[in-house]
Amino acid sequence: QAAQPSAQPTLAQVAQTPAATQAPAATQAPAATQSAATPAAQPAQTAQAAQAASGVAATRTNQTFLSYTSPAGTTSQYHVYAEGVDFSKPVGVVFYFDGDYWRNDQSKVYDPSGELAQMAASAAAQNMLFVPVISPDANRYDAGVTWWEDMERNGEFFRSFASSFIAANGVDSSNVWTMGYSGGAEFITYELNTKPQTWRNGGGSIMVAGGGLDEGTPSAALKSQPMFWYANSNDGSGETYPQTWSARGAVEGGYNAYRNAGYTNASATVLNGSGHFDYNFSQILSNSLSKGKATAAPKVEQKAEQKTEQKSEQKQNTQRARTM
């Protein structure tokens, strides 16, 4: 796990944020079903062509435990939540990375009908697919299955998968979000957001109970994109493994590192929750996507104003040149 930052400045406390509750685990994941409101799947030839070109099949219904192998030979699985998404309109996507675990029953990614389904509903409300990705890590010893160990391999796998998925499903590449919890949040801030963004040209990042940065340089391409960190007030040292690691410390350190690197559309929120295992992920996702949309709107208007000012200035310069 990444080292805890040495300095932990105090963040503003959220006064009315209730303590989040853990969603109950489902005993068995249901088979994938198609919503009556979901448009019919693409014609077979179109879907097959998309799959052949990208290595990922176009998906219009909920699917679980699909496999993908990267060009480097790294293989893992993912889920797709597509119900409630209107494919006649621009479609975005949220890729989700869970925290560390030793047994499958310790991770949300092995319970597709539990909290993941609730998070998918939050994404669908913004017309976005929800895609939890399982770490390629096969080592269940030491730190367990993680995203932050062997990040170069995991990063190559995910960037390849994301590019293929976005192409196969016609996703708007300017509306691609990542969300990570604990070690999954560390993967975003240490790996994905410090490397070239060849797989997307817009979107945002959500880090829950993690997301530090004490080495590496944030990508300049993301400076205007939303980055939102969240930590429970009591999620400090002793809450998780290793005992010396503090999720809240990682949140504060990562937020400060990215802000100092020029990321102006960033925020860090301390929730009135308990410890490391008490987060309302669907609420955090819903709030973050809404906040990201709200903070992005003024920037578009500002750019339009800048273009108007530039045209006016160019016109004045032309008139001056003609006068001279």
Q: At which residue positions do the language-model features occur?
A:
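Active-site machinery of serine-nucleophile hydrolases
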Residues: V91-V93, F97-R159
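Primarily recognizes the serine-hydrolase "nucleophile elbow" in alpha/beta-hydrolase
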Residues: A167-G170, S174-L222
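Alpha-helical scaffolding within the catalytic cores
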Residues: D111-A121, N193, A209-L222, G249-G253
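C-terminal catalytic histidine-bearing segment of alpha/beta-hydrolase fold enzymes
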Residues: F228-E239, E252-M324
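Structural recognition of the beta-strand scaffold that forms the well-ordered cores
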Residues: H79, V93-F97, L129-I134, N175-G180, ...
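A domain-start/cap signature at the N-terminus of enzymes
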Residues: A3-V93, G253-A266, K291, A297-K299, ...
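Gly/Ser-rich "nucleophile elbow"/oxyanion-hole loop immediately N-terminal to the catalytic nucleophile
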Residues: V85, A143-G183
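Cell-envelope and extracellular/periplasmic
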Residues: F97-N104, I166, Y181, I188-N193, ...
